[in-house]
Amino acid sequence: WMETFAQRGGQLVIHGAAVGDLDYFSRTYDLVLVSAGKGELVQMFERDARRSPYSQPQRALAVSYVHGLGPRPEHPDTEGVRCNLVPGVGELFVMPCLTTSGRADILFWEGIPGGPLDVFDGVKDPAEHLSLTLGLMERYVPWEYARATKVELTDAGGTLSGRYAPTVRNPIGRLPGGGLVLGVADVVVANDPITGQGSNSASKCAAAYLASILEHGDKEFDETWMHATFDRYWDTAQHVTKWTNAMLAPPPEHILNLIGAAGQLQPVADRFAN
């Protein structure tokens, strides 16, 4: 995509960026969009407490990219994401993916902070990280561990751990020089990854912003336009945020009953999944 952008006449510059750079950009260009994960740039955008019910991380996250995972026993010929719920402990997601070394799988623990899965802080050695992951699988999801006995990391960078509070932010960043910038994707809506909606939501944010830019024509991209543009994205994103935050809380009894029924009754499973 970056190559296509450049081929079509865009100027692609790969360089570190600080708030001072954004000051310059805001004076030079009609509109500056900020896409970032965390750090100085994200701190310009204030947390929206009204839309952010959690002020602390709700899961301790640990990811391993592996080769050698066995097929799904129920559906050995098809790919799919598997979600294992361990009440009071957390969740294990198993996801197929592509990485620099080809086809791989992701073993992704989401642990309740302070619980038995919250053991990855300070673990820097990738082999130790994978060993912890597999040990927890053997204890809590032995059916998944049974097909993971021969896995190995895709590479030395195949592990990741951390945590963050799910946060919705004010979409407008105010620069020291008086300029305004508009946040994009995770800058403005950073949901927990428990629902796996980060990339989808970022794409929908880009599409909503593009539509607003094209519709605006040659008029100024002022503060009113920025708020309206974010609100257009939030019309979709709010439902993802609500669903994701609900997944972080203990499931109510009717949800457990629904999932249990879906495991026994095919018509319920079909309606639930589709």
Question: Model-derived features: where do they sit?
Answer:
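Glycine-/small-residue-rich beta->alpha transition segments that form the dinucleotide
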Residues: 29-31, 35-40, 187
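Conserved SAM/SAH-binding loop
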Residues: 15-21
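Helical element adjacent to the flavin cofactor pocket in flavoenzyme catalytic cores
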Residues: 1-14, 26-31
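FAD-binding beta-loop-beta segment adjacent to the flavin cofactor pocket
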Residues: 160-189, 193
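Central beta-strand plus flanking loop segment that forms part of the substrate or channel wall
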Residues: 45-82
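C-terminal helical "tail/cap" subdomain of flavin- and related membrane-associated enzymes
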Residues: 195-196, 210-274
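Conserved FAD/dinucleotide-binding core of flavoprotein oxidoreductases
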Residues: 86-159
